[in-house]
Structures are given as C-alpha cells and as structure tokens.
C-alpha cells in the first residue's frame, strides 16, 4: 500500500538530456526513483529527453479519434478479432467503447516497430503477442509519427530501467535483457464525453498496471486520481511539460516487495453550468519485456513474461467480447472505499 501522500512528487530528468551524464547525477536520480517507487509509486517526470512535444502527441489522437479523424467504419477495419471476427489482428489495433462497461474508452494500440514476429508466439493462446501493427491506409505520415513516438518512449524506458537496476542495488545492465524483442505498447486513448443523463463519475475503474513501467501523457482535461494508504483519491492533474511514471505489479514483484504498484482511476471532467460534457485524450506507453523473457525478482522468484501477460489479459475488457462478464477481482470504487473503511476499523 502507498504512503499518505497528498500530491505526486516531481522528478527532473535533466541529467538524461546530457550527452554524457555524470555518475553522481545518475546515482542521485536513481535514489530519487527509489524514494518515489517506495512511497507513492507515481511521479511526474519533467525536463524530458524527448523530441516529441505534448502537442505532437495529442495531434496523433486527434487525427485518429477527432471530428476530422477516422469514421467508425474505418476504425472497425482495424479492430481486434475479438470485436470483428473476420479481422486477422488479435493483439494490436483498435478497440471500441464497450456498452454497459464502466471503462468508457476507445483505443488504438501499436507495438515495437522492429519486434520479431514469432511463428510460435500464439502457442495455445488465441492472441498473437508479436503480430505486426495495423494502421489506417493513410496518411503514411501518421504511421511514421506513431512509430517514432514509440521508439522515443522505448529509449527513455531503457534509460529508466537502467536507473531502476541501480536503485535496487544491481548493476545498471541488470535489466538489459528486457529490451530484447520487447513487447512495449503505445496506446492512444479517447474517453468520449459522458451525457449528463448518465450518472457516472468513474470512466476507468480502479486498477494497477500489470507490467514494468508506464509512461503517461495526459491532456489538460485531467481526471487521473491516485489512491494513497488512507484510501483517499489524490488528483494528479496535468503539469506543464511533464509525463507521469508509475510502476506495475511485475516491477513491484521484481523489487521483492520494496516498491509498490499503486491503484489509480480516472474520473469524468468537472461539470460546469451550461458547458457541454467534455471528453479527453490519454496516451500511455507500457514498457514490456519480450515474450520469452525470464523476469527474475531480486529475491529469486521467476516468471516468463509472456505467460504473465496472457494471464493478465483474461481480465482486460478490450480482449473480451461484450457478452463476457467482468472478472470478480475488479472492484468498483464503492467496493474499494468500503474495503478501506473496514481496514481502518480493524
């Protein structure tokens, strides 16, 4: 469980913008990340070593989901086989909003542009985790910019996991094998506006991420909330020039319990008198090891990443038909608040 924080810390990555950062600067940065991941599990990262700006990132969302973006028919041509049985893609591509589900979003996902396609990747699973990306036929520039953004975030993740290793008392190369045939996912998300007639405040139910690291670009609309140890939901609005980093369940396991994967959700934008409900865009990047990567914790536990991922996917709505019931281990916000109140009493 996280500590009793009231806001997210801010960590500057200015040291990573240097062509040759000093060992002392890198050690200090690793120490900051250790503190963050031991307490909040979330932080803002500023002074980013990226060429893509905030506007560049959300222009991709607007070109895909916006008023002048793709029609629903065009998006469904890219939909996963779960939603369009005649389509070939099972893991990458588009997923539509699910009627009746609390997670009100649609998304477009792509993987590592250079990932090796494995003929045995599916095994006994219906999902091919190393399949090629799918893109709309035009414009070609959209493909290129998505791939470039993915590459930049993958490179930043590689720098961060090197620091993570140092923070855990390991050599900086300890996680280098995670980068081989990485399955990292870039996800463009659109949370449509919710009609006032629909009494729903949560647009993404409380959860932790399942993998290693998540890097999140969020727009100015906001809505991200992070849960502290008291069960309070702490708003994490957009900070100019920042992205948000958080660790997933797997990195918490790798740390031997030293670090925490913190619950978070997203709420609808605040209601304003006479103002139309507003949607939002969000662009998370999930840093993931390769399909056959053996992920080992510092206390000796091991798991094959592909097996871990396939197990987690069973509970993700975008890989289920609309008729599939939600898993019992997904708690509503009300359920979580009740649980936390009982914990306090006990």
Q: What are the roles of these predicted feature ranges?
A:
Residues 1-346:
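Peripheral, non-catalytic segments flanking oxidoreductase cores
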């Amino acid at each position: 469980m996280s500590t009793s924080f009231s806001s997210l810390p801010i960590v500057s990555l200015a040291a990573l913008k240097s062509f040759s950062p000093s060992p002392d600067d890198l050690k200090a940065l690793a120490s900051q990340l250790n503190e963050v991941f031991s307490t909040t599990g979330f932080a803002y990262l500023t002074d980013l070593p990226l060429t893509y700006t905030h506007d560049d990132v959300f222009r991709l969302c607007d070109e895909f989901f916006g008023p002048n973006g793709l029609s629903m028919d065009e998006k469904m041509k890219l939909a996963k086989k779960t939603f369009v049985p005649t389509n070939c893609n099972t893991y990458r591509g588009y997923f539509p909003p699910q009627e009746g589900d609390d997670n009100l979003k649609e998304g477009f996902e792509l993987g590592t542009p250079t990932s090796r396609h494995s003929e045995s990747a599916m095994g006994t699973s219906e999902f091919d985790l190393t399949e090629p990306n799918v893109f709309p036929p035009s414009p070609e520039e959209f493909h290129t910019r998505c791939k470039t953004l993915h590459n930049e975030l993958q490179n930043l993740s590689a720098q961060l996991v090197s620091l993570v290793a140092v923070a855990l008392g390991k050599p900086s190369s300890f996680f280098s094998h995670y980068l081989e045939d990485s399955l990292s996912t870039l996800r463009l998300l659109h949370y449509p506006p919710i009609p006032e007639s629909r009494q729903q405040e949560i647009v993404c139910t409380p959860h932790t991420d399942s993998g290693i690291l998540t890097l999140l670009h969020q727009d100015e609309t906001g809505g991200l909330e992070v849960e502290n140890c008291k069960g309070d939901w702490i708003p994490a609005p957009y900070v100019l020039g920042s992205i948000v980093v958080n660790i997933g369940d797997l990195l918490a396991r790798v740390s031997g319990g030293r670090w925490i994967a913190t619950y978070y959700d997203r709420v609808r934008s605040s209601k304003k008198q006479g103002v139309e409900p507003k949607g939002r865009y969000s662009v998370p990047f999930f840093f993931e090891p390769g399909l056959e990567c053996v992920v080992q914790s510092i206390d000796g536990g091991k798991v094959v990443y592909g097996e871990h991922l396939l197990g987690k996917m069973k509970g993700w709505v975008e890989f289920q038909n609309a008729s599939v019931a939600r898993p019992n281990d997904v708690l509503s916000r009300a359920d979580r608040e009740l649980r936390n109140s009982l914990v306090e009493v006990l």
